[in-house]
């Protein structure tokens, strides 16, 4: 009409098609131009995504405003978006006229539950913000989250390798899948450098007070000379550094993710080009010191508060030592197990008063059922030695079980074993939740 030709083509890519670039594509043929028709791309409109801007989608698609674009280009753009794994659905339509072609993309974002965060282990020359900026320029769909399927993780890996090459930096980029052991699910995708040695020369603690810095330095001593990885530093924070604060009442102390400062290369010739030394930087926000105001037991009946009191070391008015509290509660659990309460659990619940800088603890005890001694089985010994040990076992069937007894039994009966032989002893306790009994197997093995 009036010398103008309007043509509309639709293309749909559903979630199942994302799994295979070669999957069949559904396409309508209404008014479809010839496959080699090309028009100047004059506009791109994006709908349906809350994760990306129009500019990011355009960059990821490979299309360019002002350049010729035809049916094959649009199919390739859809393939690029679909193969990334960041969309569960891609639909597009375009209108071609004498002035050019306008394309509309209708997208459905992949659910957040199907994405995991990306982490960077040892890219010591870059901060997280610098890496993110570089990657978003090179991989427009990357925003610190990666899909469980699709090729986006490979695109990120390639971009990181290209960045290293451009900067003349050593290392080969690899990635691994990190699992959450408690949930048996993928928790992160971790990018790291291989074929390069990055060693920790020193550790700094920005934010730490002068009186605690020496204690942190001692706690971090095993890191000196170790390979620099953020996961190793995170483990050191959890098990070595944070307890320095928790022992002294800094109950809200927090460590930020570690960074690194690359040190000047050695000039002695002893280092190769792929040997890097760094100072690890572990920022800390100590917070305030909390003193214990009071402690309250809840859920106890089998053991009295008077019996439990000697096991607890949280004096009112003194800085709350959560490391000691954890140890104390483990001892409380052991006491319950020695009385036959084999499934007893004790959990602390802290209630903070920030104005007074105090903390109250509720110690919640789930005692569980009383278990009694079941059957005893001794294996690995000759008949006579087995008979001697069975006679020495005084925890009889039907009596409340004592989880401390097997260890004491081993200590007291060593003289009953055949002489001249070193024995490895393993004790296995089997709980019968229905009958509330504990069967004990003691196995002896010659070393």
Residues covered by each model-derived region:
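Bacterial N-terminal signal peptides that target proteins for export
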Residues: 1-12
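A composition/secondary-structure signal for short, hydrophobic, low-basic-content segments
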Residues: 6, 21-23, 28
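Bacterial N-terminal signal peptides
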Residues: 10-20
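Periplasmic polypeptide-binding modules associated with outer-membrane biogenesis and secretion
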Residues: 25-447
């Amino acid at each position: 009409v009036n010398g103008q030709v309007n043509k509309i083509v639709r293309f749909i890519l559903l979630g199942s098609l994302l799994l295979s670039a070669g999957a069949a594509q559904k396409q309508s043929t209404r008014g479809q131009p010839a496959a080699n028709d090309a028009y100047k791309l004059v506009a791109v409109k994006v709908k349906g995504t809350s994760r990306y801007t129009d500019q990011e989608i355009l960059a990821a698609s490979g299309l360019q405003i002002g350049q010729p674009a035809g049916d094959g280009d649009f199919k390739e753009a859809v393939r690029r978006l679909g193969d990334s794994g960041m969309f569960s659905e891609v639909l597009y339509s375009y209108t071609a006229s004498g002035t050019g072609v306008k394309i509309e993309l209708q997208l459905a974002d992949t659910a957040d539950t199907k994405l995991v965060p990306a982490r960077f282990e040892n890219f010591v020359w870059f901060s997280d913000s610098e890496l993110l900026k570089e990657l978003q320029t090179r991989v427009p769909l990357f925003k610190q989250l990666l899909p469980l399927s699709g090729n986006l993780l490979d695109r990120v890996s390639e971009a990181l390798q290209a960045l290293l090459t451009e900067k003349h930096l050593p290392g080969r980029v690899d990635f691994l899948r990190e699992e959450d052991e408690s949930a048996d699910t993928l928790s992160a995708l971790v990018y790291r450098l291989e074929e390069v040695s990055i060693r920790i020369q020193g550790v700094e603690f920005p934010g730490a007070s002068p009186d605690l810095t020496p204690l942190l330095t001692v706690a971090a001593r095993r890191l000196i000379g170790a390979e620099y990885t953020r996961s190793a530093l995170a483990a050191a924070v959890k098990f070595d550094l944070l307890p320095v604060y928790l022992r002294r009442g800094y109950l809200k102390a927090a460590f930020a993710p570690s960074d690194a400062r690359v040190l000047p290369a050695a000039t002695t010739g002893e280092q190769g080009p792929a040997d890097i030394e760094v100072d690890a930087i572990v920022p800390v926000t100590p917070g305030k010191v909390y003193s214990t105001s009071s402690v309250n037991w809840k859920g106890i009946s089998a053991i009295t508060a008077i019996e439990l009191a000697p096991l607890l070391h949280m004096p009112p008015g003194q800085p709350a030592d959560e490391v000691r509290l954890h140890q104390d509660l483990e001892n409380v659990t052991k006491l319950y197990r020695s009385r036959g309460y084999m499934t007893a659990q004790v959990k602390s619940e802290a209630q903070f008063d920030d104005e007074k800088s105090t903390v109250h603890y509720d110690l919640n005890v789930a005692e569980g059922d009383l278990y009694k001694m079941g059957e005893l089985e001794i294996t690995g010994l000759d008949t006579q030695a087995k008979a001697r040990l069975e006679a020495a076992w005084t925890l009889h069937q039907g009596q409340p079980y004592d989880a401390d007894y097997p260890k004491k039994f081993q200590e007291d009966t060593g003289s009953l074993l055949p002489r001249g032989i070193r024995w490895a002893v393993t004790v296995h306790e089997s709980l019968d939740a229905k009958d509330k009994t504990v069967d004990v197997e003691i196995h002896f093995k010659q070393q």
